[in-house]
Amino acid sequence: MPCLAFVNSWFTAPPYIRSRCFARGSEVVFYYIYFFFDFKFNTMSNTMSDKNSVNFTRREFLGTVAAAAAFTIVPRSVLGGPGYTAPSDMVNLAGIGVGSQGGGDIQNIATPDVPIKRRSFGGGGMLMQPYAGIQPPRRERRASDNPVQMGDAEKQSFKHANIYALCDVDHDYSGHILAGYPKAKKYTDFREMIDKEKEIDAVLIGTPDHTHAVIAAYAMKAGKHVFVEKPMAKTIYETRFLRDLAKQTGVVTQMGNQGHNIEGTMQTVEWIQGGVIGDVREVHLWTNRPMWRQGYFDRPAGVDIPSNLNYDVWLGPAPDKPYNPEMLHFAWRGLWDYGTGAMGDMGAHTFDAPIWALNLGMPTKIQATSTPYNKDYLPQSECVTYEFPARGNMPPVKVTWSDGGIKPARPAELEPNRQLREALYIGDKGLIMHGTHGAEPQL
């Protein structure tokens, strides 16, 4: 049995909430995008990219949790000069799931003590055949002999928190990050780390989607503050559970959604709410993903578990099924048991600006179509339309999501020399387009 079977007592959801049917899955993904933690904590930025922002002290972090709104930030100069923070004032941060996205987040919080060697974002699951008009990405890149090349703006070292501990189920896959922080304590089981390391103040969760909720809940129950990567959880029930638990425990929490606070996203919000393109009644969002296996495939046959992998902890609350390397390291996104597909991966980014700009609440209708799928893999391609009622002085609006090679129709008014971007807003006075993370909006 999976070692996290005990979580069944936490997440005893009605069967209809755990339904794997496509239409329900699309509705669930909308909740991934829409439900944020009630407590927003900006000391660990949503983009995790502002390397030169002012530091905050551990004493203040711990002393103002009960009044998070009154939290203050102390300039570096007060703590010992530019770029310096006393070690005793550093928040002790633990990273959980650091082989990929989580490792990038950690590096954006503190410069590695040892230069980190380059490794790909993807894993074995990125190796696939062309499908639905999508070309497979280049072969998996592995750790090279050369350190990551940084631009002049990135060469300055920084440390916004003390990387106190790092936890990953696969110390081979995450080895480049573990080696970069030799002083951090190393674990493969997040429960053991949280139980033993009482000095940990906060955790950063960058694991596969299916373990976000159980790890966040375990940390909050232990009094640890939580930053969890998007999607916050995998089901509606889990998001509500975490929301309520955050209130009960009083810890500060944040869901990471890279792009939410970049200039481009805010520019789009200002344009739309300022009426620059008039009333918006139609929005089209799309991505070229999945870049991993999705569709009508059989689950790969089980093979022996390698010694470097703590597979029980990787499974977490998921069904106890045989191991195969084609399910891990980025490829998990395409399986119902572990991921949320192309929409759950990129939709969280691309939906963000329209939800904010158009004050979207709950849809009144969802219509979805897809290519064939089965009990193991999400569909290769899908098209989902959400219908929202009028909101104040904003008219009803339809928001359509497409992936797996499906794109929206090109508007007649779009100039021939302009490419169709990943987000398209159609107003009665004009158009707005921007990229997946709200990047570079254009009128």
Where in the sequence are the language-model features?
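Structural recognition of the beta-strand scaffold that forms the well-ordered cores
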Residues: 92-95, 164-168, 186, 204-205, ...
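N-terminal glycine-/serine-/threonine-rich beta1-alpha1-beta2 phosphate-ribose binding loop
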Residues: 32-224, 240-252
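Contiguous beta-strand/loop segments that form the cofactor/metal-binding neighborhood of enzyme cores
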Residues: 65, 75, 79, 267, ...
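A contiguous active-site-proximal alpha/beta segment in oxidoreductase catalytic domains
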Residues: 225-227, 232-308
